[in-house]
């Protein structure tokens, strides 16, 4: 065809490929039907398919060398006609035509051309549709007879073809038939002999011209020759042996092997065989074409001149035959498939010398096969489905009956029947075993479901009961449950693992503060309780179940929410047990009994305190060391009142305090406080409180200063504003009112009175600078002068009786403040603040007047007194002030140091928590990453050691 066109310099298109099967062995299978209706239809509709919809027009496109390079042209229109006329006997032939079309495009054109990109897009769509094709190829219908009209048309057309001048066709056929010889002579198989010299020289020249043209434009010559050798029409036509059409043949005529083939065809394809088909597709892929092409088709002995091939190789094998057997499902398992592939390679190694090029190709392809075959999963026998066994049993028993009827006298048929019977028995046994396994596997699931339902019902009942019980009883139940859980055997614990998953789903996740508090609480636990903590974590966290309980690292971020909640319950229960430590008898007591016992204890303590106070009152003048013990008793009283946990208990204790001996308690409550001696060095706390509360002006005696202290405290607790009283109006035993301020504050906290109500006024710090004066006999004139000045603002209804004054002091200690609401407390606090401001103003006025008077007194006294009369009031007050300020500074330093230490501990805890969080995040980030530098270092070390 192309030789005369080159000689005359005229480009002539060859006739299109044939689409009518002259051998009449075409079939219509489900896979071919899918290729026609789905694959071809979608490819035809694609926007890039227009260059492939008809044969290449070399005349129109001015491609004189196209048909010299492309020996087997193909297009979508030819494939469509072949599918319509049932040209193909199986789907693999049609798929081969599609691949030929794409390969022709890649072979002739450059890699970056537009037509190549269009072909790649079409091929991608083709492979996607091909993956959805049915796995098993089955004949759809019986072969239809060709109508007479069509036969006549075919005969007329064939007659026309014969009568027409067919010079070009003859030349094309002559070139087509011997084209195998030069191709194989150029290929690595240098074993061709006995070919005709003329035809080989002509075709060799033709191929070399095409190769030169191809080398100038697209790719090297070797790839062109190899690709053209694959798709030569004579090579494929001679090598492909179509399977016989078994539909038209009766079953009784077929031999035993073909009957066996029919039995296997109905069996489902296993997972291993699917992997084998994928391996076969991989070996036939284009990326392995350079070393796999000699094994695509059977060895053509006549074309290659290998007359002794079948003498050496007894069982020839190739990839085309293996693919055909795989399509026909002749392989029962993956090992038979592997045996055929290895047989193909062994034949190559056996016939060719070791240094031959084909042997190296075979080794490369075998490496590909072995690597993929080693990755096939191993299928257990029990994994076969029941439907597979049932179909096999029915088919084999049916064939057994037919075989018995058809082969009564033949010994070969008898052996076949025995084999089928054994197979049926084995499959029945396998079915029975499989059913037993299913029954056994379903039994524990039912038991677990029943246990789950029972446990759910029990949980609901427990919740209803627990809602009505006391919290102490709930704690007892928790303890009993924990003991029972410890005593349970391991098997019982394993059964409850399924129930924990429900708790895990319902558990509320913890925030950062809760986790931090939980870690602090765990650190507070004693050593004997930590074992239970480790047990809870290991039982609920499978990742930590195998860890060493003696040395375990716990990251709260990795623990489940249910585990954290369980730990929180256990730790809180343990911490509740530790401070209480109640005896066994008191556990079962009710609230009323507990309240009654506490009341009795408080009453006893109050009686003891009252008795001691009475004794202290008698002995105050004689013995001055006793009041310190009374202070201790008062502190015991305050501790007993503050130890009551609930509000009802505090009410009962306060009511007892107020109700017992109204006259005695009011008259004896405050005489119990100690007398302040001028020469005694006050303690740090007393100095601090007196600094904040006692506000004496200059020149006043110790008696008036004590009156200031008492009136400040009473005005802070009550709504009445009491001004300072003169010294001659004070009761005779009011010098005992210089009490310990700390104990008063403690009593007020016991009575739940807000601590803001007992704060000193704002002007106290300024008034402290005046100091505390000491009583001396020369101060009579001072007191008389102060009386006249202080009487004007103090003219209010103040009774002088002792009982009334003590009642006014005892009022703020009453428990009425406990029952007040928050609004009343706020109003009371506001009133107290207003009264403090008014009082501060009045005191400021009094202080100014006193300062003026003291200045005048100092001026007169300096003139009258001598320099050696001793220390003045001012110098003594300055000394006391210096002492107080020094002690206050020490206290301030100690408190600041304690605060700094607590802040440092908090900062350390925060830093530790922050570092742990950063470390955890870093570990999480490093889990999914690969350290390439580390990998490279390992590789270099390995190479150095290897060398």
Swiss-Prot record:
Residues 470-481, 674-692, 885-924 have a biased composition (Basic and acidic residues). GO terms for molecular function: chromatin binding; histone binding; histone H4 reader activity; lysine-acetylated histone binding; protein serine/threonine kinase activity; transcription coactivator activity. Residues 417-470, 591-621 form a coiled coil. CDD domains: Bromo_Brdt_I_like, Bromo_Brdt_II_like. JQ1 binds at residue 109. GO terms for biological process: chromatin remodeling; male meiosis I; male meiotic nuclear division; mRNA processing; positive regulation of gene expression; regulation of DNA-templated transcription; regulation of RNA splicing; regulation of transcription by RNA polymerase II. Residues 500-582 form the NET domain. Testis-specific. A 3-fold higher expression is seen in adult testis than in embryo testis. Expression seems to be correlated with histone H4 hyperacetylation during the haploid phase of spermatogenesis (spermiogenesis). No expression, or very low expression is seen in patients' testes with abnormal spermatogenesis. Expressed in cancers such as non-small cell lung cancer and squamous cell carcinomas of the head and neck as well as of esophagus, but not in melanoma or in cancers of the colon, breast, kidney and bladder. Ubiquitinated in a SPOP-dependent manner, leading to proteasomal degradation. Keywords: Activator, Bromodomain, Chromatin regulator, Coiled coil, Differentiation, Disease variant, Meiosis, mRNA processing, mRNA splicing, Nucleus, Phosphoprotein, Repeat, Spermatogenesis, Transcription, Transcription regulation, Ubl conjugation. The record marks 109, 114 as: Histone H4K5ac binding. Pfam families: BET, BRD4_CDT, Bromodomain. PROSITE patterns: BROMODOMAIN_1, BROMODOMAIN_2, NET. The modification Phosphoserine is found at residue 187. Residues 202-228, 395-420, 444-511, 610-698, 882-924 are annotated as: Disordered. Residues 447-462, 482-494 have a biased composition (Basic residues). InterPro entries: BRD4_CDT, Bromo_Brdt_I, Bromo_Brdt_II, Bromo_chromatin_reader, Bromodomain, Bromodomain-like_sf, Bromodomain_CS, NET_dom. Changing residue 89 to V: In a gastric adenocarcinoma sample; somatic mutation. It is found in: Nucleus. It is linked to Spermatogenic failure 21: An infertility disorder caused by spermatogenesis defects and characterized by acephalic spermatozoa in the semen of affected individuals. SPGF21 inheritance is autosomal recessive. BRDT is a promising target for male contraception. Inhibition by thienodiazepine inhibitor (+)-JQ1 that binds Asn-109, prevents recognition of acetylated histone H4, causing a complete and reversible contraceptive effect in male mice. Testis-specific chromatin protein that specifically binds histone H4 acetylated at 'Lys-5' and 'Lys-8' (H4K5ac and H4K8ac, respectively) and plays a key role in spermatogenesis. Required in late pachytene spermatocytes: plays a role in meiotic and post-meiotic cells by binding to acetylated histones at the promoter of specific meiotic and post-meiotic genes, facilitating their activation at the appropriate time. In the post-meiotic phase of spermatogenesis, binds to hyperacetylated histones and participates in their general removal from DNA. PANTHER family: BROMODOMAIN TESTIS-SPECIFIC PROTEIN (PTHR22880:SF175), FALZ-RELATED BROMODOMAIN-CONTAINING PROTEINS (PTHR22880). Belongs to the BET family. This is Bromodomain testis-specific protein. It comes from Homo sapiens (Human). The gene is BRDT.
């Amino acid at each position: 065809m192309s030789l005369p066109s080159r000689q005359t310099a005229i480009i002539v298109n060859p006739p299109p490929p044939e689409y009518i099967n002259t051998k009449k062995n075409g079939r219509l299978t489900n896979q071919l039907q899918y290729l026609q209706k789905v694959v071809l239809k979608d490819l035809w509709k694609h926007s890039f398919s227009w260059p492939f919809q008809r044969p290449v027009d070399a005349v129109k496109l001015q491609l004189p060398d196209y048909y010299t390079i492309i020996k087997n042209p193909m297009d979508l229109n030819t494939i469509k006609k072949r599918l319509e006329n049932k040209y193909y006997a199986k789907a693999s032939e049609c798929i081969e035509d599609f691949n030929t079309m794409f390969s022709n495009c890649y072979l002739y054109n450059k890699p970056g051309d537009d037509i190549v990109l269009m072909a790649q897009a079409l091929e991608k769509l083709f492979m996607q549709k091909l993956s959805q094709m049915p796995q098993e190829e089955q004949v759809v219908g019986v072969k239809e007879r060709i109508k007479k009209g069509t036969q006549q048309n075919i005969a007329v057309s064939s007659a026309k073809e014969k009568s027409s001048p067919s010079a070009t066709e003859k030349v094309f056929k002559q070139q087509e038939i011997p084209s195998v010889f030069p191709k194989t002579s150029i290929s690595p198989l240098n074993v061709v002999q006995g070919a005709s010299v003329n035809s080989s020289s002509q075709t060799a020249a033709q191929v070399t011209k095409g190769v030169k043209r191809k080398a100038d434009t697209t790719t090297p010559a070797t790839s062109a020759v190899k690709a053209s050798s694959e798709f030569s029409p004579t090579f494929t036509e001679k090598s492909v042996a179509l399977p016989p059409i078994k539909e038209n043949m009766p079953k009784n005529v077929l031999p035993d092997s073909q009957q066996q083939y029919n039995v296997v065809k109905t069996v489902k394809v296993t997972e291993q065989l699917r992997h084998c088909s994928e391996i076969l597709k991989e070996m036939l892929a284009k990326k392995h074409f350079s070393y796999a092409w000699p094994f695509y088709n059977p060895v053509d002995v006549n074309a290659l001149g290998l007359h002794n091939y079948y003498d050496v190789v007894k069982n020839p094998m190739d990839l085309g035959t293996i693919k055909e057997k795989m399509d026909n499902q002749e392989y029962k398992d993956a090992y038979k498939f592997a045996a055929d592939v290895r047989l193909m390679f062994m034949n190559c190694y056996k016939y060719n010398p070791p240094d031959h090029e084909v042997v190296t190709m075979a080794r490369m392809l075998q490496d590909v096969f072995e690597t993929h075959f080693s990755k096939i999963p191993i299928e257990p026998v029990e994994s076969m489905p029941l439907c597979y066994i049932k179909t096999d049993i029915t088919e084999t028993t049916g064939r057994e009956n037919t075989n018995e009827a058809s082969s009564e006298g033949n010994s070969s048929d008898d052996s076949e029947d025995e084999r089928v019977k054994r197979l049926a028995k084995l499959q029945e046994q396998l079915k029975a075993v499989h059913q037993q396994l299913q029954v056994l596997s379903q039994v524990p699931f039912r038991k677990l479901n029943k246990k789950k339902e029972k446990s759910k019902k029990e949980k609901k009942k427990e919740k209803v009961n627990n809602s009505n019980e006391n919290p102490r009883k709930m704690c007892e139940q928790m303890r009993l449950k924990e003991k029972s859980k410890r005593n349970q055997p391991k098997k019982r614990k394993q059964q409850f693992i399924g129930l924990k998953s429900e708790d895990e789903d319902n558990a509320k996740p913890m925030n950062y503060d809760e986790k931090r508090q939980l870690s602090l609480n765990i650190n507070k636990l004693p050593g004997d309780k930590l074992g239970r903590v480790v047990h809870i974590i290991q039982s609920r966290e499978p990742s930590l179940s195998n860890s060493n309980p003696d040395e375990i690292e716990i990251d709260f971020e990795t623990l489940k929410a249910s585990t954290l909640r369980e730990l929180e319950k256990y730790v809180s229960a343990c911490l509740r047990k530790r401070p209480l430590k109640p005896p066994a008898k008191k556990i079962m007591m009710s609230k009323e009994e507990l309240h009654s016992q506490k009341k009795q204890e408080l009453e006893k303590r109050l009686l003891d305190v009252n008795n001691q106070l009475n004794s202290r009152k008698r002995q105050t003048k004689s013995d001055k060391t006793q009041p310190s013990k009374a202070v201790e008793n008062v502190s015991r009283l305050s501790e007993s009142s503050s130890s009551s946990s609930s509000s009802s208990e505090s009410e009962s204790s306060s009511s007892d305090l107020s109700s017992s001996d109204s006259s005695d308690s009011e008259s004896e409550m405050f005489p119990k406080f100690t007398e302040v001696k001028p020469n005694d060095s006050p303690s740090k706390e007393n100095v601090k409180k007196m600094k904040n509360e006692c506000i004496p002006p200059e020149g006043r005696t110790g008696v008036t200063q004590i009156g200031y202290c008492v009136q400040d405290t009473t005005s802070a607790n009550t709504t009445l504003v009491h001004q300072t009283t003169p010294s001659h109006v004070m009761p005779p035993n009011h010098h005992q009112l210089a009490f310990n301020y700390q104990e008063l504050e403690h009593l007020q906290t016991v009575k739940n009175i807000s601590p803001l109500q007992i704060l000193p006024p704002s002007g106290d710090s300024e008034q402290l600078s005046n100091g505390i004066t000491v009583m001396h006999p020369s101060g009579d004139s001072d007191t008389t002068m102060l009386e006249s000045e202080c009487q004007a603002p103090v003219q209010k209804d103040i009774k002088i009786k002792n009982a009334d004054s003590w009642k006014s002091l005892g009022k703020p200690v009453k428990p009425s403040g406990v029952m007040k609401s928050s609004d009343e407390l706020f109003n009371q606090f506001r009133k107290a603040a207003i009264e403090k401001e008014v009082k501060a103003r009045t005191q400021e006025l009094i202080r100014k007047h006193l300062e003026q008077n003291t200045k005048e007194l100092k001026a007169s006294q300096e003139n009258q007194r001598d320099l050696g009369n001793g220390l003045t009031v001012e110098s003594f007050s300055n000394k006391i002030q210096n002492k107080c300020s020094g002690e206050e500074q020490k206290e301030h330093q100690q408190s600041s140091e304690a605060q700094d230490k607590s802040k440092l501990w908090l900062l350390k805890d925060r830093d530790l928590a922050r570092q742990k969080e950063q470390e955890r995040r870093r570990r999480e980030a490093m889990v999914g990453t690969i350290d390439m530098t580390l990998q490279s270092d390992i590789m270099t070390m390995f190479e150095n050691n290897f060398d």
